Amino acid sequence: MPEAIQIYVCADNCMRGVVLTAAEMNAAERFSFVIVEEENLLNGNLEDVTIEGVTDVLKKLEKKPKAVLLFTVCLHHFLGCDLELVYGELEARFPEIVFVRCYMDPIMQKHGATPDQKLRKAIYDPLTAGYIDKKTVTLVGSDFVLDKNSDIKRLLKNKGYTLREIPACKNWEEYQCLGAGEFFISCYPPAKYGAEMLAERLNRKHLYLPGSFDYREIKEELRKLLQELQTGQEQENISDIKTISEELEAFCKREIIFCEAAAGHAKAIIGDTSIVLDYLYHPRPLGLAGFLLKHGFHVTTVYLDSVSPEEKNVFDWLKIHHPDLELCATIQAKMRVLPRHTEEKVLAIGQKAAWFSGSLSLIHI
C-alpha cells in the first residue's frame, strides 16, 4: 500500500521475527513497533498501551503517512482488548490518517478466515465506491504486478481495457483509483475472500480466475473474462457468442502450442533429474506436479500441509496414475529431524522444497 506504514503492537519475543522480515524486505523505514511488557498484561491497560504507543510513533515521524496498517496480536484476543475503542481514539487523534485493521494472530488460523485472507481484505478496506472508470479493471490481492505477457493482461489490452493493481500504485491517489474499476478480478486463492467482500461492498462484479495448470480450466476462465468484457460494451459493439468462441479457440490454440514447446525444451534440459516442489511456490502444487508428470518429468515429492478443494480432481488423478508420489506435511514435528540430503541430484521448486531436500538447485520466484 503506497504512502503507508506498518505498526506492530506485540511482545518482544514475537517482534524478533517481524523485525527480521522487515529488514529482509528492505522495508525497515516503513516499519515501527510498540513493545507490550508483562506489567501491561497484569495491569489490564493494553488499550492504553496500544493507543499511546501508536500515538508516540506517529508524533515522532517527520512526515505523516496516508495510512497505518496497525497489527494487533494474540494478546489482544486473549485479554479481550476493546479494539473498537483503540481504533476510535486513534482516528479521533489523527483524522487525516486511515487506520487499517490488521491482525497477526496465528492462533486463529484454524477458525474462519486465515490471517493471510484477513490482511488481503483489510488493505482494500479504505477504497470507496465513488465513480466507475470505464474501460478499467482492478486486480485484487496479488503480491506482484501481473506479467505483461499474462493471458489476462493481453486480453484486456486487446479490448482496450486498463488493468489496475496495488503493487503498481506509486502514491495514495493511484491506490484510491483501484475502487473505480468496472469489475474486480482475483487470481490468488487467499485473495478471493477479500475480493468478494470488496465487490459486495462497492456493488461490483467479481471474477475469480485462479492460476491453473489445466488447459480446459484456463480456457473456461478466459471465456468468463471475455463475456464480462462483452457486457461492458455498447450494444452496437457486442460480438455474438460464436465470435467470442472463435476468438478464444484461436488464442488458446496458439498459447497451448507455445506452452508445450516450452515444456519440451525444459524437459530436454532437466531430463530425468528428480524434482521436489512445495506449496509456497504456487498455490496449486498438485496441479503443477500433475502437469510435470504428464510431460515426462520425474517428480518425487510435494511438500504441502493440506489439499485445497480446488485440487481434488488432480489429487484423485495422482492417486490413480502416480501412487508413488510422496506428499509431505511441512508442519509435522518429525520434519525437524528427518535427513535433509539425497544421494542424487535434486531440483527443488520452492524454498521449502529446497530446505527439506537439501537441494542446492532451486527454482524460486
Predicted features, each with a name:
Residues 1-365:
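An N-terminal assembly and electron-transfer interface module characteristic of large anaerobic redox
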